[in-house]
């Protein structure tokens, strides 16, 4: 199925492909190559991005990719979405293809040589907080950055990366834990495939109410992390996000 992304360089067409957690363990050599190519092209057009989630965790804990990870996680700000969309043409020339691009301009997955990169596009939710697909994060982890050496290049990372990992993963963040069910049963794989197929193919009248409820649930999960972090700190470091503040982004690509 051919889908379209409107860019400043014309209409970018791509074929939607279903991917889901637990597909396979990443090939680190190819992933490293992909990351360095992405950085070179992003630097050429002035696109600012940083390492995120599992890739950031590996960078500060293993100083490498996490051995049991399956992809590269990067993030950009919503303000840079048009620069990123224009970059898709250059990425294609280097062998990358878009696998999925969320209709809310919040997630893009790129694949090259069988290895993929997830690009999380964070928009402002409320004061000091950003989110993509309901996944909230303190804005400082996306904007207050520092440069580190990683995989043969220099990459931006949250200046308080260790603090982010403590907030996101809890006190066990320094202990490697394989979370992906790479040996999942066939029916589990089919259910995962169905979930993501629905995510990208449901009509708007069904998709947006579903994502609104999903986002509200993720904000509740974020507030539980706030409670956990404050308990670890022994004081109130962060306040919870007010109930009812989540509103789904309906910006279309």
PLM regions: where:
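Soluble, non-transmembrane catalytic domains of enzymes that act on hydrophobic metabolites at membranes
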Residues: 1-4, 253
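Active-site nucleotide-donor binding segment shared across nucleotidyl transfer reactions
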Residues: 39-72
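Glycine-rich, aromatic-lined ligand/substrate-binding cores of catalytic
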Residues: 168-173
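Functionally critical loop-and-helix segments that line ligand-binding/catalytic clefts
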Residues: 161
